[in-house]
Design a protein with these regions (language model features):
Chain A
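Helix-to-loop junction immediately C-terminal to a conserved catalytic motif
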Residues: 50
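ABC ATPase C-loop
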Residues: 147-148
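Conserved ABC transporter NBD signature motif
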Residues: 58-66, 78, 111-113, 118
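Helical segment within the ABC ATPase nucleotide-binding domain
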Residues: 169-182
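Conserved ABC ATPase signature
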Residues: 130-134
Length: 234, 330, 357
């Protein structure tokens, strides 16, 4: 059984239908990459799963639980974390406070804290600094750290490499690889190199519909398909 | 010049503004004893306005809800406290300080309890159906304000009501040739205690952390697994209770209150919130103190300008900082 | 579907035309002074409410300063007539001065607050309006303070003026109505209101109206397409302010008296809000319906309530409910219910209902 199932999902924002028919099965384990052009509906798909926008009609189910109509907070409590495109950092709070909020009961588990500090040493260094003073890359690290401070089943990540320096992208890829051993990642990405390096399964969304889905290896080998779906020249 | 500005920023930035105002006023007024009296009055007034405004600011910050009916809580607080003080007039006039304190404590408590209950009702009935619709939100809260004011009029009548002060808070303390009204000191200290308690809650407790995070990014707090709407009810009730407390204290300060009190304070509260920046209690405090001081200084220096002074202050600050002095980080 | 929507809208238009006809012939249909008062007030408030609808209905921003602009116009005309005497030059100068002050204030408020946040705008207009109110009562040497000012208007509008005389030198009558200055004054009010209202209808029908609707539907999208949202909003705010100001001048000329209660008080602002919500926001025609209903209710229903309360003095509770002092309370309750259940108002709901049928 797949971990997350999107069934004929449609989402409107105001009077504009952004998603027309998104049907997708995300299997448990590994990294599932969602590709697509700007405005194709990738972010909307993630937000619809998270309940931040309500899909109707259509349904989203997670391990057999129907998420449609559930409150975002309750969806999160099922073990789904969200790393939004703008990172969603609380700038007025310190790094520590940002992470404390993401814990279930307000205290840190020593092991997961140690893991975060190992993956992202900068966070330990700026532990008591206000989060707005962090660099873009450090904010992205904090956002990911918030998602993994508690054990989760599924993490939705929206364009984590956008605007980041190459060295930080590498660190991010390393972290994702490690996280994906125990947790399923649903990754929206524009950076195809990054996506290819990490992804196991993938789908391309085009104009609010799933245009292709399959394994990343097959897709990476098929240059024609890439060219037609992503207008990649390479 | 740049260096000068950095230095100012380091030692407190905009927080120094009230100090600068006080300093300028000192030279304009020229008589130290008058200046002290006015400054104390301004600080006391500022603290009471802060109580009235803090809830409005937090509620807006957290849920983007601007409650035009907020001043109804101020009025109700004032009238409820006035009624309780009226019933306990015997205790107020007693020589025993304990009875005095008990009376004023009960009056304030009644206002707070009323504020909590009214806040809960208001949130559930008036605000909840129009969370995400600013236009209807403004209209409905204005409608609620009309209804609330008419209720006050129906219950307490249109004539001014006398508010007795407890014995131990009447009169003034003499420091040299400076007379300081006891009630003002009391109002300032009580306001300060509430501010510190609020500040502590917001910075040291988990619920405070949630509120601060929610003010910045509501969606993200929900995506972390917290029900903001439930938190919001609590904040709304707290804000209403603080407004009612502010109104109760204001009633004791003015000693004569009319149903127009709410409408008058509403303007001041709005100006404070705009000056201070929405969503942060530090900003609200700063705005309230500024308004309190400026109102008192200008009232002394140029009485004709007194009523317009708040407005001029607001315009000046908005031109300088369109988002207010210390808005919450967004 | 579109056709049926049109049918609903046509019905609303028909009602509005009927009201216009009634107002046009009001002096002949209802031959008493009070009725003429009511008719003139309706004319002025239609313009005032429609100009407010221009703002709230077509840009979605809420201003509490609309009475202030109305007041500028009224006080402008009133002060000029008082200081310069009852001439047309005073009327013109006062009206223009009022409109100019309104324009300047609107530009200042708009530029200061419209670019920040729509909600700031509501608060700032409220603050500005309250300062205007305070100023009007403080500058009593010009404004007459709380008492207001009375003055004479041009001779043409005097009740004693004979527009048409019969052979024996008396005022001629048409269908029993004296053709005197009062009649001229009424038609001055009617014609001015009609011109202003038609201007607004044309404005919302023009390309500008279309852009405004686009901004109202989706601000971010309109901005992305390249419309300068702030500029358009400020523009509409200015137009709406100037029209409110002109309406104020017209009303001041009709009443021959201007004071806080007739031109500046916050209760007028509440009336405007009620009228625009009752009638229906964003429809223009809704303003007509809302103004007619509210003014009629103010003049007749309130009295009726008082009479009923007295008549039912022995019945428990009813006298309390019908007490005219509770008028505003009930209006507030009705207002809240309307915003909840009929946010489109009468005009909007009518058009909708026809569609559904």
């Amino acid at each position: 059984m797949s971990l997350l199932t999107l069934n004929a999902m449609q989402t409107r924002i105001g009077q504009y239908a952004v998603l027309h028919d998104v049907t997708l099965e995300v299997p448990e384990g590994g990294v599932f990459v969602l590709l697509g052009r700007n405005g194709a509906g990738k972010t909307t798909t993630l937000r619809s799963v998270m309940g931040l926008w309500k899909p109707s009609p259509g349904s989203v189910s997670f391990r057999g639980t129907d998420l449609t109509g559930m409150h975002t907070a309750d969806i999160a409590r099922l073990g789904i974390a969200f790393v939004p495109e703008d990172m969603g950092i609380f700038g007025g709070l310190t790094v520590e406070e940002n992470l404390v909020l993401a814990t279930a009961n307000g205290s840190f588990d020593t092991d997961s804290l140690a893991r975060i500090w190992r993956l992202f040493p900068a966070l330990e260094q700026f532990w008591t600094k206000a989060a707005w003073s962090l660099s873009g890359g450090q904010k992205q690290m904090l956002s990911v750290a918030r998602a993994i401070i508690e054990p989760r089943e599924l993490i939705l990540i929206d364009e984590p490499t956008k605007g980041l320096a190459p060295s930080i992208i590498d660190a991010m890829a390393e972290a994702f690889r490690e996280i994906s051993v125990h947790t399923t990642l649903l990754l929206v990405e524009q950076n195809f190199e990054f996506a290819r390096a990490l992804g196991h399964q993938m789908a391309v969304i085009e104009d609010g519909r799933i245009a292709h889905t399959g394994s990343m290896a097959d897709f990476a080998a098929n240059k024609d398909l890439q060219a037609s779906l992503l207008s990649l020249s390479a | 010049m740049d260096r000068f500005l950095t230095t100012i920023d380091r030692i407190g930035g905009v927080n120094l503004l009230p100090l600068a105002v006080a300093l300028v006023a000192f030279f304009l007024i020229g008589v130290p004893s008058s200046w002290v009296t006015l400054t104390v009055a301004g600080l006391a007034m500022g603290m009471m306005i802060f109580l009235m405004a803090s809830g409005l600011s937090l509620v807006f910050g957290l849920m983007d809800v601007l409650n035009f009916g907020h001043s109804a809580f101020v009025s109700f607080g004032a009238f409820v406290a006035a009624s309780v003080l009226g019933w306990l007039a015997g205790w107020l006039g007693a020589e025993s300080v304990v009875l005095n304190i008990a009376a004023i404590f009960l009056a304030f408590l009644a206002a707070i309890v009323f504020g909590l209950a009214a806040g809960w009702f208001f949130e559930a009935v008036i605000i909840k159906p129009v969370y995400h619709d600013h236009l209807r939100q403004i209209l409905i809260t204005v409608g609620a304000l009309i209804v609330a004011e008419q209720m006050i009029l129906a219950v307490w009548g249109g004539t001014p009501i006398n508010v007795p002060r407890p014995n131990f808070l009447t009169g003034a303390v003499l420091l040299g040739d400076v007379a300081i009204e006891k009630y003002r000191v009391f109002a300032f200290l009580l306001g300060l205690v509430v501010y510190l308690a609020l500040k502590f809650t917001l910075s040291r407790t988990r619920i405070g952390l949630l509120i601060r995070a929610g003010v910045e990014n509501r969606e993200m707090v929900e995506a972390l697994g917290f029900r903001i709407d439930r938190l919001f009810v609590a904040v709304f009730m707290l804000g209403s209770a603080l407004a009612a407390l502010g109104g109760a204290m204001w009633a004791g300060y003015e000693t004569l209150i009319t149903p127009a009190l709410g409408a008058e304070m509403m303007i001041v509260v709005f100006i404070v919130v705009i000056i201070g920046g929405l969503g942060s209690i530090e900003g609200t405090l700063l705005g309230a103190i500024m308004v309190g001081l400026v109102a008192n200084y200008v009232g002394f220096l140029a009485p004709k300008l007194a009523l317009a002074s708040n407005m001029i202050l607001m315009m000046a600050i908005l031109l300088w900082r369109p988002n207010g002095l210390r808005p919450a980080v967004k | 579907m579109t056709q049926e929507t049109d049918r609903g809208a046509d019905f609303v238009k028909l009602v509005v035309l009927l009201i216009a006809a009634l107002l046009l012939f009001a002096p002949f249909l209802f031959q008493d002074i009070r009725s003429l008062e009511v008719a003139a007030r309706i004319c002025v408030f239609i313009v005032l409410v429609a100009s407010y609808d221009l703002l709230i209905g077509y840009t979605g921003i809420v201003s509490f300063a609309h009475t202030m602009f109305f007041g500028f116009g009224a006080y402008g005309a009133a002060i000029a007539l008082r200081q310069m005497g009852p001439g047309w030059d005073a009327v013109l100068l006062g009206t223009l001065a009022g409109a100019l002050v309104s324009l300047v204030m609107a530009i200042a408020i708009g530029l200061l607050s419209l670019r920040v946040k729509a909600i700031f705008f509501a608060m700032i207009t409220l603050a500005a309006a309250s300062v205007a109110m305070v100023l009007a009562s403080q500058l009593s040497q010009f404004t007459g303070g709380e008492d207001g000012i009375t003055y004479k208007t041009p001779d043409l509008f005097k009740t004693a003026t004979k527009l048409v005389v019969t052979e024996d030198g008396k005022v001629a009558r048409l269908f029993g109505v004296k053709l005197n200055g009062k009649l001229a004054a009424y038609y001055f009010v009617f014609a001015s209101s009609l011109v202003l209202f038609v201007f607004m209808i044309r404005l919302v029908g023009s390309p500008i109206g279309t852009i405004l609707k686009a901004i109202r539907e989706n601000e971010a999208r309109a901005e992305a397409i390249g419309y300068r949202v702030v500029a358009y909003r400020t523009f509409v705010f200015c137009v709406s302010a100037v029209i409110a100001s002109l309406a104020g001048s017209v009303y001041a000329i009709w009443l021959k008296y201007t004071g806080p209660d007739t031109a500046l008080s916050f209760s007028i602002m509440i009336d405007i809000l009620l009228m625009v919500v009752i009638g229906g926001m964003g429809t223009m025609y809704g303003a007509v319906i809302g103004a007619v209903l509210m003014v009629l209710a103010q003049y007749y229903l309130r009295d009726l309530m008082g009479t009923a309360a007295e008549a039912l003095a022995n019945v428990p509770l009813l006298p309390f409910i019908l007490n005219p002092d509770m008028w505003l309370f009930w209006l507030g309750v009705i207002f809240i219910l309307l915003v909840y259940f009929f946010p489109k108002g009468i005009a909007g709901s009518l058009a909708r209902k026809e569609t559904e049928a």
